[in-house]
Regions:
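Compact nucleic-acid interaction/catalytic patches
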Residues: 24-30, 35-75
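C-terminal terminal-subdomain/extension
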Residues: 69-137
Length: 137
């Protein structure tokens, strides 16, 4: 598949269909993800993303971080979120940067792209802590 969008940067928040493991077929429900890394390849760009979920926000486990409107309105706004979310750094998947997995949400301020926002500087320490904790497990 040809490249249809600009490649995201680490720290961007994108809209995607979390794959059903182990098949890696796109799941049914779009959700936000943090871009951890990007690998440029001749056969197509690969993106490592961190799983986002809106459930159980009050029970953060090791390797998880939440972005909520009440606790950090600046980070919430810059992330482009429509609802509070937590990201689980224990669930990282590598996916091709294509319209099979990534979708353009309705009313996207960034235009015709899956990017919905980016991480705010005030949340970076919590992000790093969650990432390191997940690696240590």
């Amino acid at each position: 598949m040809s490249q249809i969008w600009k490649i995201p940067a680490p720290g961007d928040i994108v809209w995607y269909l979390f794959p059903e493991i182990p098949d890696i077929k796109p799941g049914p429900k779009p959700r936000p993800a943090i871009v951890l890394s990007v690998e440029r390849r001749e056969v197509g760009d690969q993106v490592s993303v961190i799983y986002g979920i809106s459930r159980h926000l009050m029970r953060l486990k090791t390797g998880e971080v939440a972005i909520t409107q009440a606790k950090n309105p600046a980070a919430y706004a810059l992330a482009g979120l429509a609802y509070d979310i937590k990201f689980d750094f224990k669930v990282i998947v590598n996916l091709p940067w294509s319209d099979r997995y990534f979708k353009v949400p309705a009313r996207n301020p960034y235009g015709n792209t899956p990017k919905i926002g980016t991480l705010h500087a005030t949340i970076l320490r919590a992000i790093e802590t969650a990432y390191r904790a997940a690696l240590a497990r």
